[in-house]
Amino acid sequence: MPKVIGLTGGIATGKSTVSELLTAFGFKVVDADIAARKAVAKGTKGLEQVRAAFGDSAITEEGEMDRKYVGEIVFNHPEKRLELNDIVHPIVREIMEEEKQSYLNQGYDVIMDIPLLFENELQNTVDEVWLVYTSESIQIERLMERNQLSLEDAKARVYSQISIDKKSRMADHVIDNLGDKLELKQNLEQLLTDKGFINKER
């Protein structure tokens, strides 16, 4: 019986790397971020709803959502963030559910890659939750380097989510990413072996 695993983490914990590794191990990944982009892609009903809620300035000359413009609005106006979520989330759920069912019907184990899994209380939609863990100090350091952010901005982004330590206590399994990529791969392989997804002797 194929399994549905919820994969989550925090900003800059290395979840995308784990997602890529799991694909290499034969899992099918359904990515919430990709689904969110599809939900408001050019020519979609979702994009028209964004235009109605945020005005013509929310759409670029190319007919796509102006992410920077909308991002600044929702960052500064919590009620607008809720409005955007009300537009995007139902469409995202529909897209992800369709992809998940398609893979399950083909007999694949499915990874639901959902950054805000706990924040949106989606743990009951999967068989178990795997969390990619690193320390908050490493999160902040990686974020500053990756996104060219100041210390204050990096901290603000990290602290806008449930803390990674609290999430680790809520998850079924924690994938340690305190070291380098090779150590991360070894930690993931160990989990997959323990869970019976792969046979190391093979």
UniProtKB/Swiss-Prot annotation:
Alphabetized NCBIfam families for the sequence: dephospho-CoA kinase
SUPFAM superfamilies: P-loop containing nucleoside triphosphate hydrolases (SSF52540)
One example GO MF annotation: ATP binding
Gene coding for it: coaE
Keyword Transport in record: no
Residue sites binding ATP per the record: A12, T13, G14, K15, S16, T17
Positions of transmembrane segments: none
Name of the protein in its database record: Dephospho-CoA kinase
EC number(s) stated in the UniProt entry for this protein: 2.7.1.24
Cell compartments where the protein resides: Cytoplasm
Record-level GO BP terms: coenzyme A biosynthetic process
UniProt cross-references to CDD domains, sorted A to Z: DPCK
Keywords of the record: ATP-binding, Coenzyme A biosynthesis, Cytoplasm, Kinase, Nucleotide-binding, Transferase
Record InterPro entries: Depp_CoAkinase, P-loop_NTPase
